[in-house]
Amino acid sequence: PNGFHLNGDFQRKGYSEFTYRPFTLEGNMFSADALQEMLFQMKNGKIRLFPAIPEEWKEKGVSFQNLRGENGLMCSAKIEDGILTWKIQSEKPQKVSIEAFGKVMEGLLEAGKMLTGSQNMIKYRICKRKE
């Protein structure tokens, strides 16, 4: 979706019978949704942590708490000092796949129990040895 929305014809151009300029939340909610999608995504049991954040955020640190996923899942995660940590809790048992920065981890969530994890994000550059 592109976020375009026509609600009322306050300029009286014939687009709608409603000629008032109503207050709408689409623009505000669109930006909040985009930010959440940068931090956390979930579809069909596959969780993606920080899938679209800028490199600068990874270096400075970023976090979110208690974002809802599908099937009663609640997730919190943070990046601090090059370490990603996360906590996931579910209202019902389910298998999940957690993807972050090219690595995939799988786990079984029990109802009411917390699944936690950590991942070192520091990358090393390997160079050919000069002879």
Predicted regions and their residues:
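Non-catalytic C-terminal accessory modules of carbohydrate-active enzymes
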Residues: 1-130
